[in-house]
Amino acid sequence: MKILGITGGSGSGKTTLLRAVEQLGGLGLDCDAIYHRLLETDDALVAAIGARFPGTVRDGRVDRPTLAAVVFADPAELAALDALTHEAVAREVRRRLWQSEAPFAAIDAIGLFESGLASLCDETVCVLAPEETRIERLIRRDGISRERALARIRAQKSDEALRAQCGHALWADAPTPEAFQQQCEQFLKGVLMMEETKKFEKEREALLSSPKNGYDRISEADLAAMESYCKEYMKFISDCKMEREAVKWTIEAAEKAGFRELKPGMQLKPGDRVYGNNHNKSVIFAVVGSESLNEGTHICAAHIDSPRLDLKPNPLYEDAGMAYFKTHYYGGIKKYQWTTTPLAIHGVVAKKDGTVVTVTVGEEPGDPIFCVTDLLVHLSADQMRKTLAEGVTGENLRILLGSRPLKDDEGADRVKFAILMLLNEKYGLTEEDFLSAELTMVPAGPAREVGFDRSLIAAYGHDDRVCAYAAFKPLLDLGTPVKTAVCVLADKEEIGSVGISGMQSQYFEMFMEDLCEATGASKRRCFEHSFCLSADVSNAFDPLYAETCDPANNTKINYGTGIFKYTGARGKSGSSDAAAEVMGYVRRIFAKHDVIWQTGELGKVDQGGGGTVACYMANRNIETVDAGVPVLSMHAPREIVSKLDPYMTFKGMKVFYEEN
């Protein structure tokens, strides 16, 4: 620690210089303030003063005005007081210096040299000011008369004596207090502290990890691009609330950008753009690179399914004059969150004649919405005694559809019959058609900006369509990369990546085999040299539930895309656990292209856990690491992300596709 000694007469401006030290991050030690504090806390010192200067201590407290009148009128008396106080003050100064972790400190003392404190200092400076200025300051600051102010000044060292003792002098002749404050800061930076501080800061930056909020790092150009990107993303997430809709949306956008469907037997060359549609439930896109696929590909793999309420095969029924849909929830949800939430119905119905009908109700401004009812608080005594998991059961997640019975009908279930007639009139459906339907209930309404500053986005299905869009979007404008760029948008991740459209299916192998054959490469060699970013969301640190996370190892809002070495639970179970070299590669390319990123894990050890598609890609001998957007309220009907993190995830995916 470098220590600066500050001295000067009363009213010279020493305190201003000391405050400037503190504003630059240093420790300021005001010996006058320390002395006054000791007069209140050091009984031995007070007793010694009372014995040496009778009449100056009353009821155990020093009468400071009386003591000042005595000592400033007689230099010998002042020297006697200094002899009593210097040792106590010096002892307290040493204690505070020893406890401090500041990079530098300053000791402000009129008797800097007499007390021996100057011996602790690397540099010394005297602060000087015109006598008349000092008098005015003392009158204004201490409320004393002009005569007493002058007597105090005359009892102290002359300017010449101070200059002779100190290595530096600072003349406090600035026209305003603000100007003198700037003068003090310039003095400290330019003459004493700056070189040492710069060296210290460089060492800290080189040795310590000091994550910064992304808004303190992002460029103006990226800020503008972020707003544009997020506006487009909000349109996508509002339009695509189930995997079929995301597949249709991305294929249409890709075809406009020159993509065509990959067929067996096709011959491809660098720059060609192809896709594979897997039963309208998952999709893969690729841009062929200049390098052989035997040298590997760069893959971004995300999923486009989200937790929801799926209709049961026989969903429609009536009870107590109201019609309902029975549901079976899909993925991990907190069931109580879905009550009273406005819901829309999305999906398709495959009719007996082979036609497929698309159904969407609840999204347009004039549409009705649907909901799961909840129990009124007045009758909730039993319910409230249950756990959150038990308070609302999965079987009771039933969708209220209507209550108006069919007029002039005397049969049973008149409300149910009326609902079926409406569905038949609009879609040509019968009750039996529900047996071959994929209909799901999702939160109604578009994505919305959150907060007065509009810095956040609330929407259904950020997990994982926020990463799916970030993985897909760069391909639309991608030229011919060195490594072939592949984007996988998979289904069924929320229930284990199983089934024909999940990441564990053979469809990915089939597509990659066709892609390799079309370019004369080996799929096995291709996988061996490929690299995959498993693009999935992470849990953003929420201070309201801080006890579930290790803050030093948890992603945060506005700190960029999150990179995860591993996920899983109970000892990393179900994780691919990326190698150090894999993490190092991602660090390197993100740093090279100014991608703001962070790292973390899913909560405290044994708090819970979760998985991604990373392990299924790694099982194919593809180097894989998780990367994605931090999310608040994950798996809730409305999830929240910041604007900065999705944009940085997009930027990271983009440079990953472009990187060799």
Regions found by a protein language model. Give the residues of each.
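ATP-dependent NMP and nucleoside kinases share a basic, alpha-helical "lid"
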Residues: R94-Q99, F104-R141
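Walker A/P-loop
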Residues: T15
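P-loop (Walker A) phosphate-binding loop of NTP-binding proteins
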Residues: G9
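ATP-binding Walker
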Residues: S12
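N-terminal hydrophobic/helix-forming segments and targeting peptides
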Residues: M194-N660
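ATP-dependent small-molecule kinase phosphotransfer cores
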Residues: A33-F104
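Small-molecule kinase domains that catalyze NTP-dependent phosphoryl transfer to phosphate-bearing small molecules
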Residues: E92-V93, S119-L120, R140, I144-G190
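Hydrophobic anchor at the beta1->P-loop junction of P-loop NTPases
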Residues: I6
